Swiss-Prot record:
PANTHER family for this protein: RETICULON, RETICULON-LIKE PROTEIN B15
Primary subcellular site in the record, as a coarse category: endoplasmic reticulum
Topology within the bilayer: Multi-pass membrane protein
Lineage: Eukaryota, Viridiplantae, Streptophyta, Embryophyta, Tracheophyta
GO CC term, one of those recorded: endoplasmic reticulum membrane
GO biological process, one term: response to bacterium
Pfam families with a match to the protein in the record: Reticulon (PF02453)
Protein source organism: Arabidopsis thaliana (Mouse-ear cress)
Name this protein carries in UniProt: Reticulon-like protein B15
TM stretches of this protein: 23-43, 47-67, 122-142
Domain named Reticulon: residues: 13-191
PROSITE patterns: RETICULON
Location(s), subcellular: Endoplasmic reticulum membrane
Keywords: Endoplasmic reticulum, Membrane, Transmembrane, Transmembrane helix
């Protein structure tokens, strides 16, 4: 089992990132590119677009619920059927609640090291976000997650040998740096 398989696992996301199902991977990449292009270059606004999609979905669901027996063999699920203890929506809200609780515990200040790390990461994300939009960052992450594993799988030996050489060079530079730093005279301690 290769390193990429160990990292990604063997689920649907791994199949998508490794292009095992070329049609779904291609559709995902093309749709993400079109969505990014629409919002970034065509200057469409996200909230009106989401509201339009929501209105369209509500209209389709309404027509399906009222006239579903005529056009479809299956009726949509009722609200009572969706209100199940194992509902995906409840799982999503539970996960969001867990993340918010974790942030609250960090902000409460019991672990100062974790608090400072969180502040540092948020500041880094803030600085990156002031130059690049969130949508562009998410698009770059998607494209990288769909291309880097495939390129690594194809050129694994070449990349591993190159990274080995880079690691050796880094270790050599660290040794030279330690030698240079050791030659710098130390100031006497003042009491």
């Amino acid at each position: 089992m290769s390193l990429v398989d160990q990292i990604l696992g063997d689920g649907a996301v791994a199949d998508l990132c490794l292009w095992k199902d070329k049609i779904n991977s291609g559709i995902t990449l093309v749709m993400a590119t079109l969505f990014w292009f629409l919002l970034e270059f065509m200057e469409a606004r996200l909230v009106p677009l989401l509201c339009s999609i929501l209105l369209l979905l509500m209209l389709i669901l309404f027509l399906w619920a009222k006239f579903g027996e005529v056009f479809f063999t299956r009726r949509p699920p009722t609200p009572e059927e969706l209100n199940q203890p194992d509902s995906p929506l409840k799982a999503l809200f539970s996960m969001m609640e867990g993340h918010l609780l974790m942030l609250y515990e960090i902000a409460y200040g019991k672990d100062n090291k974790t608090f400072l790390k969180t502040i540092l990461y948020v500041a880094i994300i803030y600085n990156i976000g002031s130059y690049i939009s969130l949508l562009t960052i998410l698009y770059i992450c998607l494209v990288c997650s769909m291309t880097i594993p495939v390129v690594y799988m194809q050129f694994q030996e070449l990349i591993d040998s190159f990274m080995g050489k880079v690691s050796e060079e880094k270790n050599n530079l660290l040794e030279v740096f330690k030698q240079v730093v050791s030659k710098i005279p130390r100031a006497p301690k003042v009491e």
